[in-house]
A protein has these predicted regions:
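Hydrophobic faces of well-ordered beta-strands that scaffold small-molecule active sites
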Residues: 11-17, 39-41, 67-71, 114-118, ...
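Glycine-rich nucleotide/cofactor/substrate-binding loop typically near the N-terminus or early
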Residues: 17, 59-84
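Acidic (Asp/Glu)-rich catalytic clusters
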Residues: 30-34, 55-68, 107-110
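Glycine/small-residue-rich loop that forms an oxyanion/phosphate-binding "nest" at active or ligand-binding sites
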Residues: 75-118
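N-terminal active-site wall of soluble small-molecule enzyme domains
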Residues: 75-77, 107, 112-114, 124-139
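Glycine-rich, Lys/Arg-enriched anion-binding loops that position phosphate/diphosphate groups
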Residues: 106, 129-162
Length: 162
């Protein structure tokens, strides 16, 4: 009988969090934080607000979960799922604004944003549009070259992030 080798595998479960805003509660962030390794925090344009972002950062820190920004098109009513045609300057600024907001909140709590994962229509469009993907990747790198850009494999966004 052959002896099989044990292989240790690390799996990082990732989830979108902080999608409540105002009086509206969305999802069970506390339950998810118990099982995930990294969180994509809504940055206010598709969901979330400054208070929710602050609380989500606090809870993630307590759970030892790494933080990621989850920027979206300015589409609160459509939950960031409606396509928008933004100029490269507008797109870059929208991404920078949202990532910067989360970075400031995280820093105020002694934490660090480790990654960026575009949300909804922004992500879907950038996965197919090389110019849009490049705009997002350049914006993320300009903010902090150490940030990881999360993207689906074989997408234009993944290629731009390299």
């Amino acid at each position: 009988m052959q002896k099989t080798e044990e292989i240790e595998v690390d799996i990082n479960l990732n989830a979108d969090l902080g999608e409540s805003f105002g009086a509206w509660r969305m999802g069970d962030d506390r339950a998810l934080l118990a099982v995930i390794g990294s969180a994509n925090v809504a940055c206010g344009f598709h969901a979330g607000d400054p208070l929710v972002m602050t609380e989500t950062v606090r809870l993630a820190g307590e759970a030892g979960v790494s933080l990621g920004a989850h920027p979206a098109f300015p589409d609160l009513q459509g939950f960031g799922r409606r396509e928008m045609q933004l100029s490269p300057r507008e797109l870059s600024t929208v991404v920078t604004y949202q990532v910067g907001a989360l970075m400031g909140i995280a820093q105020s709590q002694g934490q660090r944003v480790t990654h960026v994962k575009p949300h909804g229509a922004m992500s879907n469009m950038a996965c197919q549009d090389a110019a849009m993907a490049a705009t997002i990747a350049v914006a993320v790198k300009a903010i902090d070259a150490q940030l990881i850009l999360l993207a689906p494999a074989l997408s234009e966004l993944a290629a731009a992030g390299r």
